[in-house]
Design a protein with these regions (language model features):
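Conserved phosphate-coordination/catalytic loops
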Residues: 21-28, 47, 102-105, 130
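Class I SAM-dependent methyltransferase Rossmann-like catalytic core
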Residues: 9-40
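SAM cofactor-binding core of SAM-dependent methyltransferases
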Residues: 28-95
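Non-catalytic N-terminal targeting/anchoring module and adjacent flexible stem/linker
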Residues: 1-21, 191-200
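Local beta-strand N-terminus motif with an aromatic residue
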Residues: 41, 121-123
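S-adenosyl-L-methionine
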Residues: 79-118
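Short, charged, surface-exposed secondary-structure boundary motifs
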Residues: 74-81, 94-98, 157-164, 179-182
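C-terminal substrate-binding/active-site "lid" region of AdoMet-derived donor-dependent transferases
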Residues: 124, 130-200
Length: 200
């Protein structure tokens, strides 16, 4: 599952590996906040593999990187000694790992529940892939009040804001929000059932 690649990298259009850092799909200001949080992390968990993965792998203070994705071909391009990667088969996908149909809808919840399967407790979780509200709910069960939870595209996507029943906002930068777990009286089973198949 884990293969070695000792250099910083990004991918060329032909699929080759170059020894250059891959930049996350964020603004410069968002990247500054992202880096600040990861500089304080040792065990990092992310929903959605990409430029954020490259940043995490290049942090000497981070000893383990867990990355979940729905695009097998994309995920297989990422290899590093401290990378633990998991592919969730949600069926055929288009850009950004979005399933094109519901042929494997029964597998969709495996994406958000993947965080239940690790033995480590992450100190940073980044939610930037599919099923983001469902991922936020499942993350809540697997972190403590000191864990940093980052969600991208949060500010402009109001359906993500229901997660504020579970988390407090520590800070925001444009579309990136940093959250911390809080006590909640919400019916989490009902909430999860509503969002477990929501690909947004």
């Amino acid at each position: 599952m884990i293969m070695c690649l000792k250099q910083s990298w990004q991918f060329s259009p032909t699929g080759g590996i170059q020894t250059v850092n891959m930049k996350p799909h964020m603004t410069d200001s968002e990247i500054l906040l992202f880096n600040k949080v990861l500089d304080e992390s040792t065990i990092y968990y992310e929903f959605g593999c990409g430029g954020s993965t490259s940043v995490a792998l290049n942090k000497k203070n981070i000893t383990k990187v867990y990355s979940i994705d729905t695009d097998k071909n994309w995920l297989n391009k990422f290899d590093h000694p401290k990378l633990h990667k998991t592919y969730i088969d949600v069926g055929e996908t288009e850009s950004f790992g979005i399933p094109v149909n519901e042929s494997k809808i029964d597998n969709w919840k495996l994406y958000s529940t993947s965080i239940d399967e690790i033995l480590d407790e992450p100190d940073t979780v980044f939610i930037d892939g599919r099923f983001r509200v469902a991922c936020g709910i499942k993350t809540w069960f697997n972190v403590n009040e000191k864990t940093n939870v980052l969600i991208h595209d949060f500010t402009g996507r109001t359906h993500y804001h229901e997660l504020l029943n579970l988390y407090d906002i520590k800070t925001t930068c444009e579309q990136l929000v940093l959250l911390s777990k809080k006590s909640s009286t919400v019916d989490l089973n009902e909430m999860y059932d509503r969002y477990k198949h929501d690909i947004r």
